[in-house]
Amino acid sequence: MAHRAASDAELIAWVDEQDRPLGSLPRAELRERGLIGRGTFILLFNSAGELCVQRRTLSKAVYPGYWDLAAGGMVQAGEPYADSAARELEEELGIRDAVLREHGRFFFDEPGNRLWCAVFSAVSDAPLRLQAEEISEARFIRPELALEEARSLPYCPDSLQALRLYLDA
């Protein structure tokens, strides 16, 4: 739980409904007050075109135990979306120096999870190094299978929206 406490205290970019900066707040306060932050979603593919899906640990504050279609997280105060994406991909999956492509942004609005989201993709066949505090397991599957599984398994709705934005682009 030390990781969760440190994560909750992290200063996060606070924005309005048009993604204009308003300042920074601790992650937990942003969530508890229903305010809007910025998030990144990095869809990691292998060279066979399979998508890395990860199961979130049960200690996560949002969607514990759910399958996630993207690495990523909250953008820190003063941090550009692209820098956040590169940082999160390395922290969560151990992938560094991958070429990131941005595919667009969307506003996700659900109680306890209000975000302006930037969607990126990367391709890598490097071995994964999972961040144990955040990810309990990972596997590569076809993106279509992930969408099919999401009908019966718990998948994060924000990363589902990120994948749909990517597929529709």
Curated annotation (Swiss-Prot):
Asked whether the UniProt record includes Cytoplasm among its keywords, one would answer no
Q: Nudix hydrolase domain location, by residue?
A: 35-163
Q: Which residues bind Mg(2+)?
A: E88, E92
Task: Return one GO MF term.
Answer: hydrolase activity, acting on acid anhydrides
Spell out the Pfam families in the cross-references.
NUDIX
As for family, the record states: Belongs to the Nudix hydrolase family.
Stretches that traverse the bilayer: none
Q: Which Gene3D superfamilies match?
A: Nucleoside Triphosphate Pyrophosphohydrolase
Cofactor(s) listed = Mg(2+)
Q: What is this protein identified as?
A: Uncharacterized Nudix hydrolase PA4841
Swiss-Prot/TrEMBL keywords: Hydrolase, Magnesium, Metal-binding
Asked if the keyword Signal belongs to this entry, the reply reads no
Q: Where is motif Nudix box found?
A: 81-103
Q: Which EC number(s) are documented for this chain?
A: 3.6.-.-
